Amino acid sequence: MYRALYAFRSAEPNAMAFAAGETFLVLERSSTHWWLAARARSGETGYVPPAYLHRLQGMEQDVLQAIDRAIEAVHNTAMRDGGKYSLEQRGVLQKLIHHRKETLSRRGTSASSATVMTPSTSDHHLDAAVSRQPNGVCRTGFERQHSLPSSEHLGTDGALYQVPPQPRRAAPTTPPPPVKRRDREALVISGSGGRTAIPSGGSSVSSGSSASSTSMDTLYTGSSPSELGPSCSPTPPPVPRRGAHTTVSQPQPSPSKAPSPEPPTEEVAAETNSTPDDLEAQDALSPETTEEKAAAETVVPRTIGAELMELVRRNTGLSHELCRVAIGVVVGHIQATVPASSPIMEQVLLSLVEGKDLSTALPSGQVCHDQQRLEVIFADLARRKDDAQQRSWALYEDEDVIRCYLEELLHILTDADPEVCKKMCKRSDFESVLALVAYYQMEHRASLRLLLLKCFGAMCSLDAAIISTLVSSVLPVELARDMQTDTQDHQKLCYSALVLAMVFSMGEAVPYAHYEHLGTPFAQFLLSIVEDGLPMDTTEQLPDLCMNLLLALNLHLTAPEQNVIMAALSRHTNVKIFSEKLLLLLNRGDDPVRIFRHEPQPPHSVLKFLQDVFSSSATAAIFYHTDMMALIDITVRQIADLSPGDKLRMEYLSLMHAVVRSTPYLQHRHRLSDLQATLRRILTEEEASPQCQMDRMIVQEMYKEFPDLGEVPS
């Protein structure tokens, strides 16, 4: 990386004008007096005089950024020309990519050895990068076009780019220098022993003796008064010209043996007489100040993740989780593809992970769009509920408007940030949720009721507190009444059973007044649907939904002797299909009622139901003999297979205890030896966890009540 000490402007073709302080990336040292360079700021390429440049150390990251900008400039120019690359553009790309590889390798070597590369070493690598070009020769023509075409040039190696295929062609050993004006002897070397004049007419250095790049950086002094920069010497060197005759310079000793020339007296005087403004300008160009400015500019606000989520969701309609995935994929790809942006992209990813709640993660003053829409929808639906005309014929004129509101509400509850939805539902002691329940009770149009049921189901998935509110509301009573009175609408009947199972899925206590509609008659109605079905139920979904509803409804009934479902079960003459479905669920180990992951988790609904069934001999008789044997097989196997400390093992032990107590198990003794061996193993377990202690207590109680279980088989 080089910085311009002086401003430069020339009428020569292919020469690049620049101001003092600009930084460059040297691509090729074409000759002693002209280097092919790329402007670090824009990626523009052209020939510059090395006498005007000063080498900067320890800026590999800036070099990589400059290379990437130059590559991008070449590709963009080619895209504007129809996607075709000229030979000159291919040559520039080749040099840029090779230089990038060398820079990455040098940075890796420097990091591993923890040493700083000296200027001579850096120059050696730069020269080696030039000498190891794939075509082995320097390209001719002015390589001014630049920048990056998208993915076709992304590679898998460290360079990340791949040069498009190009035909080989012969090239002169020296690049085309600026056109000759006149010969001049202009460059003066100020050494410790005196002055030596060197012809500047584009003389080429012989292969046997070339000046080192270290001495080249300090070789020329002076500046033109008309183009003098604030931190530059008053007299820059004259512009190098290519003369009509090429002059071979005299052999010079190698850089390691020759002493470095002293700085010219003019430059020393200029540095001594520098004004405070000049010193401030020099400080502004220092690498340390540049790095500090860059660090200050790359501070990523902590709200960037939430802002991106809001923008993507609002403009694409993707769900909250898909928005997070999309942003993470894009930011991660940028981080991997553009290494210079890695620190910034990492902060963006962290902000994306930390910003869980959009309503609080957004900058102060900004409100989440979904939150705004929920406020509008809840307020308008509440207004329509309280409308004095809602019981008149005019109510039916607003069906389309209400349907649009409910569809948008369902979309937001399903796809928006769950934290935002929970916040809006819990506002003012669940006022909005209770208003929707009251509106459902008043609304008789089937299409709107169906949308309301879907919204209630989406609300149940948000938080357990919303389920508690719905259990205590009039919704369960209204759903039970609606299911028994309107059995013709199959779709609404299915959704009513599903939502009611969701409401009862947490096993919370139901208000006593609800049993007027949720008592034994309702349980018998559900059992009849499971056993006999309904004529319009061609998909056979309704029996399974009613089965799940019975299991969920049984969760909050703690006393078996007062269990309305067990009472209905004992009165039902035939529950063959119900018992088979129950046995199938037990064999699978599934709990169809555990729909959500809310805490605290309720008991296993299938095991709880079977324990209540075998709490009485009247209900235990619903199983046929073969089904009973299969149930014992499953229970004994689960007790033997489950690990110590597993809560389910205690549930299966309690079930087996109830089976032995309420059925003639000791008469047929099915799988008795396996059961005895498992019970003995449980008693000898040394685990001290509360679950293991409870398991041992159940086994001891079984031995005490049924001594035959403790007998050692002969």
UniProtKB/Swiss-Prot annotation:
Keywords: Nucleus, Phosphoprotein, SH3 domain, SH3-binding
Residues annotated with Phosphoserine modification: S120, S260, S286, S673
Composition-biased stretches (Low complexity): 200-215
Domain SH3: 1-58
Listed Pro residues bias regions: 252-263
Chain segments carrying region Disordered: 103-126, 139-298
GO cellular component, one term: glutamatergic synapse
Biased amino acid composition, Polar residues: 106-121, 216-226
Compartment(s): Nucleus
Motif Nuclear localization signal per record, residues: 168-185
Record's keyword annotation contains Nucleus: yes
GO biological process: positive regulation of neuron projection development; regulation of postsynapse assembly
Matching Pfam families: SH3_1, SPIN90_LRD
Primary site of residence: nucleus
Positions bearing Phosphothreonine: T174
MF annotations from Gene Ontology: SH3 domain binding
Disulfide bonds, paired cysteine numbers: none
Subunit structure: Associates with the intermediate filaments, vimentin and desmin. Binds the first and third SH3 domains of NCK. Binds the proline-rich domains of N-WASP through its SH3 domain. Similarly, binds diaphanous protein homolog 1 (DRF1). Binds the SH3 domains of GRB2 through its proline-rich domains. Interacts with FASLG.
Stated role: Has an important role in stress fiber formation induced by active diaphanous protein homolog 1 (DRF1). Induces microspike formation, in vivo. In vitro, stimulates N-WASP-induced ARP2/3 complex activation in the absence of CDC42. May play an important role in the maintenance of sarcomere and/or in the assembly of myofibrils into sarcomeres. Implicated in regulation of actin polymerization and cell adhesion.
The protein's name: NCK-interacting protein with SH3 domain
Natural source organism: Mus musculus (Mouse)
